[in-house]
């Protein structure tokens, strides 16, 4: 074959390889670095990507996301990421400020709640801040599954080489989450009575309780982390008595004496739930803590004779 023809063949082959080559990220073997803001999203993303990508918390374990203020070293970390997964509906507003101040203000962002039906927010502080939705969607199995599917789909667009693996892993994870809920519901002989009323210390648990067909009758705190005034506390206790509320759900290790006052004055039974927002990050954290939450709600219903 003439040398000129060999060159043409080589050029055509090189062009074909370039057209068929996977995205640069897959080509050089580099794994995606995915930033997350909250513990549930670490679990979601870790179970979706397996060993195909790296999951990086934006804030270290031990910080309260409700009180967190961005630090320089945490903002700098965003420059090492390829994408950030957000709750995006009010629970991680700090991330928007961090991204805007980082080396990558245009970094791709996945809003996990894009397809989740949202509940209205409660409390004066929420209304005063202009927030009209409850951001605690991760405390619902149903909403979590929707978020997992959204995250897997969007990650697949950024990393096509691993898109099938992400979808497969998301389905397996969703199956386990459904099994958690099904097991909890199966332990109830019947649905709670229509007049079975519950209250919560703050507005985090509406999504969880709706899994059992329960509506929250009263919320004690005006907003998450803001203790009620003495007059507000008295009004709440009177309301719990008048409405014959049987159960109040608090938060594990909730550091407040007024919870005991409510329990003593109103006669309600107190049960503690996890907000899944503290401690170490791990792939299994969400399943472990949600299993305990579901067990607690089942026990509350059974012990109240509902």
Protein language model regions, located:
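Bacterial N-terminal signal peptides that target proteins for export
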Residues: 1-13
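N-terminal targeting leaders only when they are immediately followed by extended low-complexity/repeat-rich tracts
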Residues: 8, 15, 105-108
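Intrinsically disordered, low-complexity regulatory regions of eukaryotic regulatory proteins
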Residues: 10, 25-26
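N-terminal signal peptide c-region/cleavage motif recognized by signal peptidases
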Residues: 21-23
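Extracytoplasmic metal-acquisition and chelation regions
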Residues: 26-306
């Amino acid at each position: 074959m003439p040398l000129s023809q060999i060159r043409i063949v080589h050029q055509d082959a090189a062009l074909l390889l370039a057209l068929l080559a996977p995205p640069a990220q897959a080509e050089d073997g580099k794994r995606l670095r995915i930033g997350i803001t909250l513990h549930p999203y670490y679990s979601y993303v870790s179970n979706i990507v397996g060993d195909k990508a790296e999951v990086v918390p934006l804030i270290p374990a031990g910080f309260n996301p409700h009180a967190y203020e961005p630090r320089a070293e945490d903002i700098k970390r965003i420059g090492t990421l390829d994408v950030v997964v957000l709750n995006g509906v009010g629970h991680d507003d700090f991330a928007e400020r961090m991204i805007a101040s980082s080396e990558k203000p245009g970094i791709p962002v996945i809003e996990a709640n894009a397809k989740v039906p949202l509940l209205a927010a409660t409390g004066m502080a929420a209304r005063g801040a202009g927030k009209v939705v409850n951001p605690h969607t991760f405390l619902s199995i149903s909403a979590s599954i929707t978020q997992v599917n959204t995250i897997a789909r969007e990650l697949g667009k950024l990393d096509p080489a691993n898109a099938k693996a992400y979808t497969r892993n998301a389905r397996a994870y969703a199956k386990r989450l459904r099994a958690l809920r099904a097991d909890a519901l199966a332990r109830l002989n019947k649905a709670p009575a229509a007049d079975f009323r519950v209250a919560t210390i703050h507005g985090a648990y509406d999504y969880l309780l709706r899994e059992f067909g329960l509506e929250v009758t009263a919320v004690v705190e005006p907003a998450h982390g803001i203790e009620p005034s003495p007059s507000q506390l008295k009004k709440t206790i009177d309301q719990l008595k008048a409405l014959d509320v049987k159960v109040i759900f608090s938060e594990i290790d909730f550091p407040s004496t007024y919870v005991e006052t409510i329990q003593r004055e109103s006669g309600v039974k107190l049960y503690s739930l996890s907000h899944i927002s503290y401690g170490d990050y791990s792939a299994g954290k969400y399943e472990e803590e949600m299993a305990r939450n579901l067990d607690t709600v089942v026990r509350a219903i059974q012990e109240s004779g509902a």
